[in-house]
């Protein structure tokens, strides 16, 4: 089990990015959260087995929403301090 945080910049708010991210996470068995930030970026905490997590990260970098455009993903591996049971959108 591995946990990463991602800060995604670009056109990622108001375009279905969080909803699509949640759908992809659920398809891959990834748990965690996704939320909008005041600066226009999106923050993701994703937790899962290594291979599904790698697929999830690739899909995020490729912009999961048709209307979105990802400019940059700041990715960090963090300690598994919290165990998520599902993937949810934080409002």
UniProtKB/Swiss-Prot annotation:
Q: Which InterPro entries match?
A: Acylphosphatase, Acylphosphatase-like_dom, Acylphosphatase-like_dom_sf, Acylphosphatase_CS
Q: Which UniProt keywords apply?
A: Hydrolase
A family per Pfam:
Acylphosphatase
Q: What is its EC number?
A: 3.6.1.7
Q: At the top level of its lineage, which domain of life is listed?
A: Bacteria
Q: Where is the active site?
A: 18, 36
Does the record carry Hydrolase as a key word?
A: yes
- GO-annotated molecular function: acylphosphatase activity
Q: Which family does it belong to?
A: Belongs to the acylphosphatase family.
Name listed for the protein in its UniProt record: Acylphosphatase
Record lineage: Bacteria, Bacillati, Bacillota, Bacilli, Lactobacillales
Q: Which gene encodes it?
A: acyP
